[in-house]
């Protein structure tokens, strides 16, 4: 056995769902257990157990070893890990309002109030859906390099979706927020009237017009921009995708992949939803520069990919729970700000489209193609925002879009907390950007 890792995981969570003024769900749960990962005969083995008794851990260890030997007999690619820096640490992220200390009835009361604010905004509001989730996770990683780290992290998230209707026209407004914090997140969102904003958006979109169709210069807000960086580009820079031949930038290290004004980072040290101090291989988290001034300079790594690509791991391997092995994941991904004001960015556009709020997206990572449906937009004419637009979608080629970024703003914001799915594992992430401008984007949508 050349490598062994034991990872304890525990998550205590609660969730609430309110629909149209009725509390539909009030749940809570605990999951816990240990995952064992080994390299035996130069092959990976993994097994997990929900029971943490010595006998069950021994059984899981035997299963992991047996699995590695079975794989070795099949001639699967050899496993290898880079020798990591030894770490011994205990980290506890403190919440101002520990979710466990807030009475469930109080949580429901606040959610009902948020839902009511949205529901009573207008008689054109026809459906409201407000959800809440908190979770406190404990991860302990101990491996044969001598690393022993523990990290306790609270996360809280709230979401409000409002559907408006006028005749046959139906529109949706969405607001959400969260991060590494406690119930204070919900109090802040309540103060910011986030559910009212969702309702206001949905109702105003009823009087918006369909978008123009064609190829345009577009200006995108922080949410559209951040999620573009995460979905369209970030997954291409996860080293397992590179090694698996599924990345459009696999052979472009050191080459220009974007405009000179583009710098893209993934930074787990930022206190946002993707924040952590140690990844689930026990590696200390560091900021990762992926693209610097338009040039591809780095990938996100695990211990294995770092060994295979002769790189240094900076803390990018995480697992959903003890039941899964760590895989390479993004954390807080963003486009770094420059110095242009929003008004100046618009001023250079004779005719284009301003896009705000991501609704949904589809990315073909291997082909480098993206399609995004945004919440709303505005027509830009001679540097001024004009007609309000609904049902807007955009599509294009990722690398072409990055190279056609002609302006990057200074108004940086990271405010897209969510859960990113990959290989059956949902992991907390965040994304951000300043406003930025792209030429040559195909705009369309429902007419």
Residue ranges of model-derived segments:
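N-terminal small-residue-enriched
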Residues: 1-447
